[in-house]
C-alpha cells in the first residue's frame, strides 16, 4: 500500500514538471511562447471555417469530459482558425498534443494553452496641444543702469512759417482763416535736442547764414493805388550823384523778400492780395468814369 501511494505523488510531480517544461520546448515543430500554462486546456489550431464548436466538442470527448470549447473570431464574427478546448478532469495534455489528429481531412495543430503574462501598460491620456505664442518683445527706452538716461522722442514741431501764414481777414470781427489756395515752400529748421535737467550735453550748432533784408515800403490802404512796382534802395550808391532807384517788379521783390526774410512773407503776400482787389476796384471805377465822360462828350 505504501509503495502504491508513493508512486502516485511521484507521477503527479513528474507530469507537472513535464507540463511546465513544455513552455521552453517545441510542440510539433513550433516554438511555444513564454507564459503560464493553463491546466487541462489544449490549444487547437488549423480549424476550418466550416467547423463549429459542437463538432469540436464531440471530437475531443474521447480524451475526457469537455468543459468548454472556444473558437476565436474577429470583430465581424469570422473564425480566425484557432481556439481552445478545456476539460473538467485531469487529462494528459502532452499525450493529446503528441497525437496526430486529422479532422475533416485537415491536420490540426495542437499544443498546450499558454496564457501570456500581462505586462503593465500605462494608459497615457493625450492632452490637448495648447500653443502659447511668445509675448511680444518689450522695448524699454530707459536703461537699467543707475545713471539712467531717458531718451524721449522730440514732439512734432509745426513749421513756424506755415504756422503763422494766415489769410488777411476781410472784417476785423471775422475769425482767422488759413490760406488753402496758395502752396508755399516749406522751410526746415533744426532744433537742438532736449536733455534732462541737471545734465550737460554738447552739440554742434550749424553756422549762421547772413540774411539780407530788402525793405519794401508799406502800402497805406487809404492812399491811391500805385503802379505795380516799388523801389528798392541799394546798400551803397552806384555813383556820386546820390542813391539811385531801381524799378523792380513787385511780384519778384515779394518772392526775394520772403526767401531771405520769412517774417515779411505774410505781410508782403497779404498786401499784394489786398492791393490786387483794391486795384481791381479802382481800375473799374476809373473805367466807369471814363465811359461817363465819353458819353457826356458825345
Curated annotation (Swiss-Prot):
Keyword set includes Transferase: no
Listed Low complexity bias regions: 11-27
Region (Disordered): 1-27
CDD domains: RRM_DAZL
Domain RRM per the UniProt entry, residue ranges: 40-115
Region of interest (Homodimerization), ranges: 80-132
PROSITE patterns given in the database record: DAZ (PS51890), RRM (PS50102)
Subcellular location: Cytoplasm
Pfam families: Daz, RRM_1
Outcome (variant: residue 82 to D): Abolishes RNA-binding but not homodimerization
Domain DAZ: start-end pairs: 167-190
InterPro entries (alphabetical): DAZ_dom (IPR043628), DAZ_RRM_vert (IPR037551), Nucleotide-bd_a/b_plait_sf (IPR012677), RBD_domain_sf (IPR035979), RRM_dom (IPR000504)
GO cellular component, one term: cytoplasm
GO biological process: female meiosis II; germ cell development; oocyte maturation; positive regulation of meiotic nuclear division; positive regulation of translational initiation; spermatogenesis
Modified sites of kind Phosphotyrosine: 276
Family: Belongs to the RRM DAZ family.
Protein name: Deleted in azoospermia-like
